[in-house]
């Protein structure tokens, strides 16, 4: 993969909390997954969580492109179904499960006990703010750099992501906001993709 513009900036950014906001086919999910993989390879033994709010979406829409990235990089992962994580050859782990609890009384049950260096939430506009705040507390794995990545579709201006956590002016310390469009990812798409989408929408 080739990264350009704001996606390239995102890929090398080490800010603790990063919001890469973009529309359909802007490449944000792919870039985030490759960023996780780069972290796993650079820091053997690091633990990440990659997820969507829904477990079904995590398994059907996030796990496959993650596995594809690993395969392209020549990394053969071992799936541990008991704890829901992929283990890379160097001992790094990427947990892959949704955050939504079936029982609201156990809203944070999936997260409690996890010790992570990195968290990635795709489609983060679906994530309730209280779950986001709970996730922040999971960044505690000793000896590794910590980072929280989010890739939402553009939310409403009153959404907690835009209003409280990631203002466009980037005025919050240790928080970085990026906005990308499909044109920032045009070099990774077939020539007919953008014209087809423009015609459809």
Regions found by a protein language model. Name each.
Residues 1-201:
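Phosphate/NTP-binding elements of NTP-utilizing enzymes
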